């Protein structure tokens, strides 16, 4: 019979199970396990014991994932999504990641609106489901005018993808105020503007999705991107606060919020 002599292995399995239990439940559930950890090390000499502990760890991990999914969806479901009726707004979508998002939506014939000061490639607009509005999202009046026109001519958007962003590759002491304010206006403050314009209609219907494009720089900065990293880190707080307000202040549990950490951006 398979025999494990390592005295430390028993502690390893128990630690894995405890960590998973902490995520799935709470620290209170860990007290019995913590007591076991304080006991003298006992060797695992039986295959059944090792197998049992492995199954427990896997089970707790699966339970944790299931509970996390429920939490992210506010413990509710929404079967009303019909992509032939949904309307998506994407900011900064004339190039880069935004353009790719629009391309994928166009392939699915999902009605999509680009808000960008720079026009997209003409080939994109040949798709009847894609529309373009020349909008500087740092100017609230332009955003508001575009939002009203979309709502009047079509309907209220149900998905908002705040994709627009700019970079600034300079040492902090070499930046000037104009550059820094422009970066903050595009990367951070514009998202307050677009959400204030498009979210009320979503709340009214308790149906919608807000996507925030953050970055790996939200957590890991480096030289010459201090301002950029700060703007992206602020989006984490924006996303988390928005999600809480939707549930606690507006009772709009079916409106989803997604935070995207784009690598190398």
UniProtKB/Swiss-Prot annotation:
One of its GO terms (molecular function) is alcohol dehydrogenase (NAD+) activity. NADP(+) binds at residues 89, 136, 163, 228, 232. InterPro entries: NAD(P)-bd_dom_sf, Sc_DH/Rdtase_CS, SDR_fam. The chain crosses the membrane at residues 6-26, 47-67. It catalyses: a primary alcohol + NAD(+) = an aldehyde + NADH + H(+); a secondary alcohol + NAD(+) = a ketone + NADH + H(+). GO terms for cellular component: membrane. It is a multi-pass membrane protein. The active site is at residues 216, 228, 232. Keywords: Glycoprotein, Membrane, NADP, Oxidoreductase, Transmembrane, Transmembrane helix. This is Dehydrogenase RED2.
